[in-house]
Amino acid sequence: MNSRIPEDLIERAHRGKTTKEDALLLLEVPPFELFRFADELRDLAAGDTVTYVVNRNINFTSRCTGSCGFCAFRTDDGKVLSIEEIMEKVREAEKANATEVCIQGGLLPDVGLDFYQGIVEAIKAEFPEMHVHSFSPMEVYHASRISEIPVKESLRRLKRSGLDTMPGTAAEILSDRVRKIICPAKLNTAEWIEVVTQAHAAGIPTTATMMYGHVETPEERINHMLTIREIQKETGGITEFVPLPFMPYNNPVGEKMIKEGRYATPGLEDLKVYAVSRILFHGHVDNIQASWVKLGKKFAQFSLHCGVNDLGGTLMEESISRSAGACHGEMITVDELEWMIHGAGRIPKERTTLYREAHELASRNSRKIAGCGAFE
């Protein structure tokens, strides 16, 4: 069969040198040819193993001084969990054999770095082996301003307190044109890059995300990925790339889209994003993650044939996507995740946050994560 993908593009991709022009051309290739190429590169980078992490999300407050137009989670007067309330959720996670807690929340007007350090220190004092994967670049930037200390120093202090890794959220699209429309009060592109690269310098690896499907252009998506790739070439501190389709419900940006006759990204477009991500990041970021909360379980399963090699976590609770209209649940058992992976013809493997093999695991089909009711 004649390929619509030029040979020189294929050769550049294998060397980790896919260009912006290459990526834009790939978006025009017949979808299943694109998926096949991405799947070949996935096999080279990760083999037939599909990973997941047993974790728990903890959103400590919906109260936020921010004004992001895409957010359906923020409130003006939401409850702020105390450290003891956060710890109770961590204890429940530990009982459910979680290896990671991911803690994030809204931006509080008078809460500086001490609050964030206190959370980490409380967790590490009681559960020194629990991996703390917490606080977005925006939270760190905001806390630094409140505490009147440089971001670099904030990250050093968080590292000393025991912060292991950070989620590379708050990235949205790394284009100031886009950010001025959807999140004008949020840190700009250069500031996001500064927080992430300073985190890596402090010994705190991060993930990297991209929230797409709102006001950005295809070229801005590609530029976003190339920016992440350049960071990775400089620091090597990014563990995974996570494309996140925008949920256009219950938020101003989405309401405007719907009035204009535009809705959530079509599924085929989502799969193209995952495939192009795999190709652009080949040789740089080995792990491409699909969010089953955003895509749905069956579609996330199909993404495993489009370049994806990781399905994220069990979560146990997920408030942010759900508030914006995601309807695919907020927890999943290890049994079901492994069933999905086997059903896609792949080999499931529990991992740590840093993509190392989790202790005492080959396949824990006998061990289940408690349902949501156990955490209410």
UniProtKB/Swiss-Prot annotation:
The protein's enzyme class: transferase
Enzyme Commission identifier(s): 2.5.1.147
Annotated binding of [4Fe-4S] cluster, by residue: 64, 68, 71
Cofactor note: Binds 1 [4Fe-4S] cluster. The cluster is coordinated with 3 cysteines and an exchangeable S-adenosyl-L-methionine.
Xref: SUPFAM superfamilies: Radical SAM enzymes (SSF102114)
InterPro entries with a match to the protein in the record: Aldolase_TIM (IPR013785), CofH/MnqC-like_C (IPR045567), CofH_family (IPR019940), Elp3/MiaA/NifB-like_rSAM (IPR006638), F420 (IPR034405), FO_synthase_su2 (IPR020050), rSAM (IPR007197)
Biological role stated in the UniProt entry: Catalyzes the radical-mediated synthesis of 5-amino-5-(4-hydroxybenzyl)-6-(D-ribitylimino)-5,6-dihydrouracil from 5-amino-6-(D-ribitylamino)uracil and L-tyrosine.
Family per record: Belongs to the radical SAM superfamily. CofH family.
Protein name: 5-amino-6-(D-ribitylamino)uracil--L-tyrosine 4-hydroxyphenyl transferase 1
Species assigned in the record: Methanosarcina mazei (strain ATCC BAA-159 / DSM 3647 / Goe1 / Go1 / JCM 11833 / OCM 88)
Gene: cofH1
